[in-house]
Amino acid sequence: MSIDTGSTAGPDVDTAVDPRPPRPLHQRVARPALALGAGALTALSLPPWGFWPLAIIGVMLFEVCLRTAQTRWERVRIGALFGAGWMYLGMGWMVQLTPPGYVTAGLIFSSYHAVAAGVAPAGRWGVIGRPAAHTLVEAIRLSLPFGGVPLATMGVSQVGGPLAPLASVGGVILLTWVVFQIGFVLADAQPGVWAAIRQLRDSDRTVLPNFIGRIAVALVILLSFVAPSGAATGGTLSVAVVQGGGKQGTSAL
């Protein structure tokens, strides 16, 4: 008598597991927290605080978060958190006017930067594409809805800094792009200009996007020095400023 000792295969079971171990909690929290803090630093460059270098530092930290993000959805979340830190703190005075409007406006404007972070290129050309994308959504914010909402803008953050003369060349939009471009270039950690030129001579194109960003910013700044600044006409103009509404808890708007 023979006995079948072979095993009978049961139903197929998918035993595949993700080879990547789950990241520790502090690693999962660090990047979102840094993105939120980067937005807050950007807001602190605005009045009444008004320390203009914080805008560039905030953008640099924002780019550090974006460069280490592994998926598009993660970049979207980072963009939203950066925008939230920037807008909710920068427009904090609005809560005294209309709390629902404050929450809604911050949510809408944060979503602009979430979209920009999601659609901008993620490769080496991100150092050019990302500043352009975030400048574009700021241009949209200054135009839509209802003719635009020029609050907590990057241009206002630079009024007391050396980049302010750029406004005479391209207004707040150009100033916004320069701040974003400087921050993204500095966070890219590429070699100096002369080293980059040597690498380009050796057909190393990895430094090309960063090099283009540096040259573009330098050219715009040089242009601001030679751009016409106008001259006094000798005439006078009387201007009246009226602010309506009740007590708002702010010294000036």
Model-derived regions: residue spans:
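Membrane-embedded alpha-helical bundles of multi-pass enzymes
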Residues: S2-G6, G10-G230
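Soluble catalytic regions of membrane-associated enzymes that act on cell-envelope
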Residues: A227-L253
